[in-house]
């Protein structure tokens, strides 16, 4: 006896089994799920896969998203602890990792994350050898280096979310002072995603007008308007949000979706993301830091070479040295 489906439809051909724009997210914590909902909201993928070791949480998050399938334009939402579910991904977003314990050194934290990544990264590459990996887990610059080493992928296909969010925070805070939209404020945060990031005051402009020409002291201790405070707010913002609500997730989730959109739609937009820095600005170690970079469907296709002041270069070198002093002591890479 024919089923309702058989009575309803006459099949003409089999559907396409391989997704065109699949995104997988490793880790369904606060950041992973904020990334998922931001990606779904933009309608970026035809399949979204979630992976985590916490099976009940994973199934619950999958079901919760599936129940809203009427609203976004993503046809298929799947989840499993087995990485086979990520097969044929265009982008794999890594948000998984261990949290820092009270009194724990940064080196020890990174080493514990290395041990986690030693399982995760080979599984990603096994099932999606042609994917671009977007690392979001912190400390993101070092873990992007770890991912690059463990994956065997070319450097243009291993990208850290880096200072994309720092730059967004910077532009938002500038826009609040100037009373205009963040889109109309042009400025960049480079270097480490974190305390030693570098605000490139020499390049800050609105409508092509360099703000340094209007206020030569901008970004220095001599500035009566104290624009330097804007960068301090960028650095402190994550700590402040964590103090207030326990974690950050929405802004980084939106940042991840922004990066995925540029890659999947082959937009060739410029983002401040973490990439291999060796050979630039006199840095000779294998460190990943953020530079303005062109992203496309091929991954990170070009790096912009900003004209930096001597003090800005010195700050980048200091960032690189800080990261290398941790990386050089990592085991089993």
Swiss-Prot record:
<protein>
    <recommendedName>
        <fullName>L-lactate dehydrogenase B chain</fullName>
        <ecNumber>1.1.1.27</ecNumber>
    </recommendedName>
</protein>
<dbReference type="InterPro" id="IPR022383">
    <property type="entry name" value="Lactate/malate_DH_C"/>
</dbReference>
<feature type="binding site">
    <location>
        <position position="99"/>
    </location>
    <ligand>
        <name>NAD(+)</name>
    </ligand>
</feature>
<feature type="active site" description="Proton acceptor">
    <location>
        <position position="193"/>
    </location>
</feature>
<dbReference type="InterPro" id="IPR011304">
    <property type="entry name" value="L-lactate_DH"/>
</dbReference>
<dbReference type="Pfam" id="PF00056">
    <property type="entry name" value="Ldh_1_N"/>
</dbReference>
<feature type="binding site">
    <location>
        <position position="138"/>
    </location>
    <ligand>
        <name>NAD(+)</name>
    </ligand>
</feature>
<keyword id="KW-0520">NAD</keyword>
<dbReference type="Pfam" id="PF02866">
    <property type="entry name" value="Ldh_1_C"/>
</dbReference>
<feature type="binding site">
    <location>
        <position position="138"/>
    </location>
    <ligand>
        <name>substrate</name>
    </ligand>
</feature>
<dbReference type="InterPro" id="IPR001236">
    <property type="entry name" value="Lactate/malate_DH_N"/>
</dbReference>
<comment type="function">
    <text>Interconverts simultaneously and stereospecifically pyruvate and lactate with concomitant interconversion of NADH and NAD(+).</text>
</comment>
<dbReference type="InterPro" id="IPR036291">
    <property type="entry name" value="NAD(P)-bd_dom_sf"/>
</dbReference>
<comment type="pathway">
    <text>Fermentation; pyruvate fermentation to lactate; (S)-lactate from pyruvate: step 1/1.</text>
</comment>
<dbReference type="InterPro" id="IPR001557">
    <property type="entry name" value="L-lactate/malate_DH"/>
</dbReference>
<keyword id="KW-0963">Cytoplasm</keyword>
<feature type="binding site">
    <location>
        <begin position="29"/>
        <end position="57"/>
    </location>
    <ligand>
        <name>NAD(+)</name>
    </ligand>
</feature>
<dbReference type="InterPro" id="IPR018177">
    <property type="entry name" value="L-lactate_DH_AS"/>
</dbReference>
<dbReference type="InterPro" id="IPR015955">
    <property type="entry name" value="Lactate_DH/Glyco_Ohase_4_C"/>
</dbReference>
<comment type="similarity">
    <text>Belongs to the LDH/MDH superfamily. LDH family.</text>
</comment>
<dbReference type="GO" id="GO:0006089">
    <property type="term" value="P:lactate metabolic process"/>
</dbReference>
<feature type="binding site">
    <location>
        <position position="248"/>
    </location>
    <ligand>
        <name>substrate</name>
    </ligand>
</feature>
<dbReference type="GO" id="GO:0004459">
    <property type="term" value="F:L-lactate dehydrogenase activity"/>
</dbReference>
<feature type="binding site">
    <location>
        <position position="169"/>
    </location>
    <ligand>
        <name>substrate</name>
    </ligand>
</feature>
<comment type="subunit">
    <text>Homotetramer.</text>
</comment>
<dbReference type="GO" id="GO:0005737">
    <property type="term" value="C:cytoplasm"/>
</dbReference>
<keyword id="KW-0560">Oxidoreductase</keyword>
<feature type="binding site">
    <location>
        <position position="106"/>
    </location>
    <ligand>
        <name>substrate</name>
    </ligand>
</feature>
């Amino acid at each position: 006896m024919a089923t309702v489906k058989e009575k309803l439809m006459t099949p003409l051909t089999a559907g396409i089994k391989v997704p065109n724009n699949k995104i997988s997210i490793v880790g369904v914590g606060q950041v992973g799920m904020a990334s998922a909902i931001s990606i779904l909201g933009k309608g970026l993928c035809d399949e979204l896969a979630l992976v985590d070791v916490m099976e009940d949480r994973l199934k619950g998050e999958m079901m919760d998203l599936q129940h809203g399938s009427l609203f976004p334009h993503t046809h298929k939402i799947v989840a499993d602890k087995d990485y086979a579910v990520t097969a044929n991904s265009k982008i794999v977003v890594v948000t998984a990792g261990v949290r820092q314990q009270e009194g724990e050194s940064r080196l020890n934290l990174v080493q514990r994350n290395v041990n986690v990544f030693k399982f995760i990264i080979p599984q990603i590459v096994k099932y999606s050898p042609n994917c671009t990996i977007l690392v979001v887990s912190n400390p993101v610059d070092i873990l992007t280096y770890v991912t690059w080493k463990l994956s065997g992928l070319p450097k243009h296909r291993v990208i850290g979310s880096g200072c994309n969010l720092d730059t967004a925070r910077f532009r938002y805070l500038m826009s609040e002072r100037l009373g205009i939209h963040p889109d109309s404020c042009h400025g960049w945060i480079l270097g480490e995603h974190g305390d030693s990031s570098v605000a490139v005051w020499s390049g800050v402009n609105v409508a092509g007008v360099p703000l340094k020409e209007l206020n030569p002291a901008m970004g220095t201790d001599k500035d009566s308007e104290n624009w330097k405070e804007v960068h301090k707010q960028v650095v402190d913002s994550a700590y402040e949000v964590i103090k207030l609500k326990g974690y950050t997730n929405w802004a980084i989730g939106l940042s991840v979706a922004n990066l995925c959109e540029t890659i999947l739609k082959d937009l060739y937009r410029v983002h401040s993301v973490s990439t291999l820095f060796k050979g630039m600005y006199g840095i000779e170690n294998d460190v990943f830091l953020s530079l303005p970079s062109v992203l496309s469907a091929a991954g990170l296709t070009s790096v912009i070479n900003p004209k930096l002041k001597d003090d800005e270069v010195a700050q980048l070198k200091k960032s690189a040295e800080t990261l290398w002093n941790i990386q050089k002591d990592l085991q089993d890479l």
